[in-house]
Amino acid sequence: MNQNLYPHLFQPLTEVTESDWQKVINTNLTGVFYCMKYELLQMQKQGRGAIVNNASIGGLRMAPGFGAYGPSKAGVIAITQTAALENADKGIRVNVICPGPTEGTGLMQDSIDAGAQDAEFLKNHIIPMKKMGTTKDIADAVVFLCSDMAEHITGMA
């Protein structure tokens, strides 16, 4: 998500306006609610299915400036886990991925454009494996969670 499109995304809670709060919550959480509601209704008719939502490491670990973003992504994790518990007996698995900084995304491109200091700091001091994730890494995780190899996994973040 490009910060230039969502300049209100990373602000302290006291600086988040009601309008900014609504934009972030509607984009990151309410949209997931509506998608899952209708996906689950269809999957319940089918008797099986798999949903993988996309949250963020920011939903697991809060940080200064995550006034609206962090709670919105934590909400995605919570609604995913609720749906997993409510639908496990119906043959439906619901999981959520929580990627961290990812090469090739708008946010990382913004950091690179700003001199790459943020990206290098993250890689060298925050990310245990010292390697940025890629969009392929994320896609591979989603494919696995949707596959029969993950038939016993539900409610995981």
Kindly give the residue locations of the regions a language model identified.
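Substrate-binding pocket helix/loop in short-chain dehydrogenase/reductase
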Residues: 9-13, 20-22, 123
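C-terminal substrate-recognition "lid" of short-chain dehydrogenase/reductases
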Residues: 36, 48, 131-157
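Active-site helix of classical SDR
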Residues: 36, 72, 80
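Alpha-helical segment proximal to the catalytic Tyr-Lys
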Residues: 41, 85-86, 151
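Residue(s) in the substrate-gating loop at a strand-loop-helix junction
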Residues: 56
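Short, small/polar-rich loop/turn modules that mediate ligand/substrate recognition or access, typified
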Residues: 88, 93, 153-155
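A glycine/serine/threonine-rich, flexible loop-to-helix segment
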Residues: 89, 101-127
